Swiss-Prot record:
Signal peptide: none
Role description: Hydrolyzes odorless N-alpha-acyl-L-glutamine conjugates of short- and medium-chain fatty acids, releasing human axillary malodor compounds. The enzyme is highly specific for the glutamine residue but has a low specificity for the acyl part of the substrate. The two most common products are 3-methyl-2-hexenoic acid (3M2H) and 3-hydroxy-3-methyl-hexanoic acid (HMHA), which are produced from the odorless precursors N-alpha-3-methyl-2-hexenoyl-L-glutamine (3M2H-Gln) and N-alpha-3-hydroxy-3-methylhexanoyl-L-glutamine (HMHA-Gln).
Organism listed in the record: Corynebacterium striatum
Protein's name according to its UniProt entry: N(alpha)-acyl-glutamine aminoacylase
Gene: agaA
Needed co-factor(s): Zn(2+)
Catalysed reaction equations from the record: an N(2)-acyl-L-glutamine + H2O = a carboxylate + L-glutamine; N(2)-[(2E)-3-methylhex-2-enoyl]-L-glutaminate + H2O = (2E)-3-methylhex-2-enoate + L-glutamine; N(2)-(3-hydroxy-3-methylhexanoyl)-L-glutaminate + H2O = 3-hydroxy-3-methylhexanoate + L-glutamine
């Protein structure tokens, strides 16, 4: 009976397909940067209110709606909705205006529309399920600390903890329009820093009267690469990237300060902490070795924990997806090196969680990837598969 009711709800999506596609195109044409998604947040709230729901504004621009439908388990689902500072080059007739210099290059518009579509299907078919569904629309995933903002704004206090929490992400993955799962670690922990090295500037012809921060920075950049190659177990995953270096504007002047932009990735939170401490140790030591008296400054930007999927829950979901979509449509893949702030949400509630990926392209992994100017999940399949997945994941807990 549960699978029959699930199928009925999924079938009901057909009647709203055209409206949902138009909604997706609106989100796509109105990209907004992290924690500045005011129009997007307003539109999400309006769509939820049309369904008779009362969304709560949590976490600056975040929106949360609770659908209470009798007794039963509770399922939460999170979708993000911020864009990226990339000029769109997809050629779509619903492309974002290039003059904006922004686009939905990571599919968050698709995540949002899929969740709104699933909520609509649940509201319109309350006779087929029982329990509670929590729709968490999260801002600022792209380095804006959106999940942390929602937690700091009292998400776990304002919204009762669900039994399980889910999230998904669209990728250019194989199989085409299929789903990928990873029991255990799915995504890495990450941190971002700016490190300011304060030397003593002066004329380029008299370096002996200076403490050259550029030379020190060069030594630091080289030494940082030994953290992964000589301090981290080869069976673990860690990356240290110096993504930017800023210092000086003149060819014959030694600057007073050099700033390094540093990013780390690690397969677990403990290793992430170790790598960050190793960076500090090396930077301090190199500055001391160069005779620089002023201590370096470590400007923390943000960090996220690793996405660790509950293994039993992941196996359960894979079985559920294979039963509904077909054996070849839900595959297990190795962990990915990307990162997400999603874990802050289930961690705040203290509930088991799973995040999975789904393919938005007929070409699978040959399609343009996330964070490129040609990233454009294909309608209608990408949207339908994303919407269906939310309902299929929630079914074991909610379907009558």
């Amino acid at each position: 009976m549960a699978q029959e009711n699930l199928q009925k709800i999924v079938d009901s999506l057909e009647s709203s397909r055209a409206e949902r596609e138009e909604l997706y195109k609106w989100f796509h044409q109105h990209p907004e940067m992290s924690m500045q998604e005011h129009e997007t947040s307003k539109r999400i709230a309006e769509e939820l209110e049309k369904l008779g729901l009362e969304p709560q504004n949590i976490g600056v621009t975040g929106q949360v709606a609770v659908i209470k439908n009798g007794e039963g388990p509770s399922v939460a689902f999170r979708a993000d909705f911020d864009a990226l500072p990339i000029t769109e080059n997809t050629g779509l007739d619903y492309s974002a205006d290039p003059e904006l210099g922004m686009m939905h290059a990571c599919g968050h518009d698709l995540h949002t529309t899929a969740l709104l579509g699933a909520v609509r299907a649940l509201v319109e078919n309350k006779d087929l399920w029982s329990g509670t569904f929590i729709a968490v629309h999260q801002p600022g995933e792209e380095g804006g600390g959106g999940a942390r903002h929602m937690v700091d704004d009292g998400l776990a206090e304002k919204i009762a903890a669900p039994d399980v929490c889910f999230a998904q992400h669209v990728f250019n993955e194989d199989p085409a329009f299929g789903y990928v799962f990873t029991p255990g670690r799915f995504l890495t922990a990450a941190s971002n820093w700016r490190i300011h090295i304060h030397g003593e500037g002066g004329h380029g012809s008299r370096p002996h009267l200076t403490k050259d921060p550029i030379v020190v920075a060069a030594s630091i950049i080289t030494k940082l690469q030994t953290i992964v190659s000589r301090e981290v177990d080869p069976n673990e995953v860690a990356v240290v990237t110096v993504g930017s270096i800023e210092g000086g504007k003149s060819t014959n002047s030694i600057p007073y300060t050099v700033t390094l932009g540093v990013n780390t990735r690690a397969s677990n939170d403990e290793l992430s902490e170790y790598v960050q401490n190793a960076i500090k140790r090396i930077v301090i030591a190199e500055c001391q070795a160069a005779g620089i008296e002023q201590e370096p400054e470590f400007e923390y930007l943000d960090s996220v924990p690793a996405v660790i999927n509950d293994e039993d829950l992941t196996e359960q979901l894979m079985a559920q997806f294979r039963e509904f979509f077909g054996e070849d449509q839900a595959v297990e893949i190795p962990p990915l090196s990307g990162s997400e702030d999603y874990p802050f949400i289930p961690n705040a509630w203290g509930v088991p969680s799973v995040m999975w990926g789904w393919s938005g392209f007929a070409a699978g992994s040959d399609a343009p990837g996330n964070h490129t100017d040609k990233f454009a999940p294909e309608l209608p399949d990408a949207l339908e598969r994303g919407t269906q997945a939310i309902l299929v994941a929630a079914a074991p807990w909610l379907m009558k």
